[in-house]
């Protein structure tokens, strides 16, 4: 038996991003395989509206993401652009923002801790 799920990244429904409890303004996600109940393992699609900003957080495990559309900016002014694949190691802390909006495919290996 084949257990398979196919997700078209450009044909999904987004809900408010509430990974830390309350929704974060201007951020929306579609959980593909991400689940807090399994230790925060899995993948989700994240959409950020123009001027949206993530909450400051610490990575308890690896977080990797691929910028599909737009740009994302970290506090050190590093700009992640379309096609960039970014890896944050456990213990990394940051928050990110976008000026014009972005679409990101996120691969999680642990639950982020809000700061």
Q: Model-predicted segments: where are they?
A:
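Short acidic-glycine-tyrosine-enriched beta hairpin
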Residues: 74-94
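Ligand-binding loop in jelly-roll beta-barrel domains
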Residues: 90-115
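Conserved short histidine dyad/triad with adjacent acidic residue
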Residues: 29-59, 89-93
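A short, N-terminal "cap"/entry segment at the start of jelly-roll beta-barrel domains
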Residues: 1-40
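Glycine- and acidic-residue-biased ligand/ion/polar-headgroup-sensing regions
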Residues: 59-75
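Solvent-exposed residues in well-ordered beta-strands and their adjoining turns
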Residues: 49-51, 73, 109
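Short glycine/proline-enriched turns and hinge-like loops at secondary-structure junctions
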Residues: 40-41, 58-60, 78-79, 98-100
């Amino acid at each position: 038996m084949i257990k398979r799920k196919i997700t078209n990244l450009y044909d999904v429904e987004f809900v408010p991003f509430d990974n830390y409890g309350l929704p974060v303004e201007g951020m929306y996600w579609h959980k593909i395989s991400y689940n807090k109940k399994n230790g925060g393992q899995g993948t989700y699609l994240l959409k950020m509206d123009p001027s949206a900003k993530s909450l400051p957080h610490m990575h308890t495990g690896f977080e990797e993401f691929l910028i599909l559309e737009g740009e994302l900016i970290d506090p050190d002014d590093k700009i992640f652009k379309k096609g960039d694949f970014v890896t944050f190691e456990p213990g990394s802390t940051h928050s990110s923002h976008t000026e014009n909006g972005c679409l990101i495919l996120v691969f999680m290996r642990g639950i982020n801790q809000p700061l």
